[in-house]
């Protein structure tokens, strides 16, 4: 059996590339971003070795079709000519030259392409509409005679690259856990030691720097197998997470005995936990530009996932609850770490320079938290609502309402029976007064136009041309 070396490692890579150029069943045209992505992947693969002619031709034809510059006509002519020559020249093996039309019939290539190639080479270039139509017909021919047969052929590749990655991740995770265990054991004994002194002053500083460098180096190492969908995005966070050990290192930090206590602990223990791990986080963040953004993003995903497991109809005040479950305790500490990192980044602390948090980001987080009723997002609101005065004023009625809901309790049937009609009226009057206050405040500071509420700025009248100090 003939074996050929190809630039993709797995059939899934080939299928992903095919999906960039062709929709399933060739129905419609893929979006422009997918076409560009396919061209980029082939360009990256070309650095690995020879690209099959049909794959390279597809890339050239697509590039010519999506080009908008003045040279599109010439680009289409060249790509069509190469498409025909690349198919027919390799089978021209006779001692005497065989007409191209005959060779074309042997591979079921319409003679239309041969005639068009002859016109491009020896006559005046055909018009742009003719070339565009020819390029599209060439792509259809390539789908029928190369891409679809290759995609549906039985794969003889028995090597499981996914399993290789999983074994690699297991080994890396064990290594990272050992390094974090070393740090935890030493830091608990030397909890007050300054870890940012010059390296030459203390031996423990040298050991600390060596441990940090080992973690950073490990995080930067590539996975054994990188999917085709992650080619040529070197400066992208998603690329770093999907193709290196960064995701493994970050996940190790979010386990028990690291950023989460080994057993259920009250939230008041957080300052002590922070004192243990903050120097290590700060040092890694200064040496790995993606570490802090990856940790921040993963924390948020974990918090949202845990919050979905809490019954939205039950409001828990964790400060008064006698015993927390493991999941509740973990969720609280993840929320505390997330709020701490966001506060540090929002206030511009130097060690968080790789993590950008704008007012829009802060507002988005607060809005999402306000839509949830779990105790973890309440922690985030309590920590972050005071960071920005403008946002605090904007959301204050919602903050107050949510706080009141958390202070309330779900009553059983017996407790409902004990409530008198007068008590219910008093409670209703209280809410009415609050609603009137909110409406009065809205009337004085907002106006409605075409269904939208606009906040009116409080600006004193002044003569035209006079500078108003804000």
UniProtKB/Swiss-Prot annotation:
User: Which parts pass through the membrane?
Assistant: none
State whether keyword Phosphoprotein applies: no
Give the subcellular location.
Nucleus; Chromosome; Cytoplasm, Cytoskeleton, Spindle pole
**What are the recorded Gene Ontology BP terms?**
cleavage in ITS2 between 5.8S rRNA and LSU-rRNA of tricistronic rRNA transcript (SSU-rRNA, 5.8S rRNA, LSU-rRNA); maturation of 5.8S rRNA; maturation of LSU-rRNA; rRNA processing
From the Swiss-Prot or TrEMBL record, what is one GO molecular function term? Answer: endonuclease activity
Q: Hey, which family's this protein in? A: Belongs to the LAS1 family.
The protein's name is Pre-rRNA-processing protein las1
Organism in which the protein naturally occurs = Schizosaccharomyces pombe (strain 972 / ATCC 24843)
Q: Which gene encodes it?
A: las1
């Amino acid at each position: 059996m003939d074996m050929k070396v190809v630039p993709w490692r797995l059939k899934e890579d080939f299928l992903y590339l095919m999906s960039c150029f062709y929709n399933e069943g060739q129905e419609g045209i893929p979006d422009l971003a997918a076409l560009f992505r396919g061209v980029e992947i082939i360009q990256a693969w070309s650095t690995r070795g020879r690209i099959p002619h049909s794959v390279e031709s597809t890339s050239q034809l697509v590039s010519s079709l999506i080009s908008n510059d003045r040279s599109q006509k010439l680009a289409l002519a060249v790509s069509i000519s190469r498409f025909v020559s690349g198919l027919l020249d390799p089978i021209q093996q006779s001692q005497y030259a065989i007409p191209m039309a005959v060779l074309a019939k042997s591979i079921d290539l319409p003679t239309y392409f041969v005639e068009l190639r002859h016109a491009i080479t020896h006559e005046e270039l055909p018009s742009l509409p003719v070339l565009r139509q020819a390029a599209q017909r060439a792509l259809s021919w390539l789908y029928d005679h190369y891409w679809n047969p290759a995609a549906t052929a039985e794969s003889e590749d028995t090597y499981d690259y996914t399993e290789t990655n999983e074994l690699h991740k297991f080994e890396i995770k064990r290594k990272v856990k050992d390094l974090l265990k070393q740090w935890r054991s030493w830091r608990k004994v030397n909890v007050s030691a300054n870890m940012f002194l010059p390296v030459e002053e203390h031996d423990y500083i040298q050991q600390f720097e060596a441990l940090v460098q080992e973690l950073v180096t490990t995080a930067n190492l590539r996975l054994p197998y990188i999917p085709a969908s992650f080619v040529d995005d070197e400066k992208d966070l998603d690329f770093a997470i999907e193709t290196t050990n960064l995701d493994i290192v970050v996940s190790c930090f979010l386990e028990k005995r690291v950023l989460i206590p080994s057993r259920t602990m009250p939230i008041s223990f957080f300052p002590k936990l922070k004192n243990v791990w903050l120097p290590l986080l700060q040092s890694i963040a200064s040496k790995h530009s993606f570490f802090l953004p990856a940790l921040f993003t993963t924390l948020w995903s974990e918090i949202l996932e845990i919050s979905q497991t809490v019954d939205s109809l039950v409001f828990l005040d964790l400060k008064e609850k006698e015993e927390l479950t493991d999941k509740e305790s973990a969720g609280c500490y993840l929320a505390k770490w997330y709020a701490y990192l966001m506060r540090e980044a929002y206030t511009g602390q130097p060690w968080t320079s790789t993590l950008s948090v704008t007012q829009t980001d802060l507002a988005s987080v607060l809005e999402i938290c306000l839509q949830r009723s779990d105790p973890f997002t309440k922690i985030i609101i309590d920590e972050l609502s005071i960071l920005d005065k403008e946002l605090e004023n904007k959301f204050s009625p919602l903050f107050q309402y949510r706080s009141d809901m958390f202070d309330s309790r779900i009553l059983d049937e017996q407790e409902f029976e004990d409530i008198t009609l007068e008590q219910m009226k008093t409670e209703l009057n209280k809410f009415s007064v609050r609603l009137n206050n909110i409406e009065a405040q809205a009337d004085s500071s907002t106006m409605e136009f075409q269904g939208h509420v606009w906040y009116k700025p409080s600006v004193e009248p002044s003569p035209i041309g006079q500078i108003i100090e804000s």
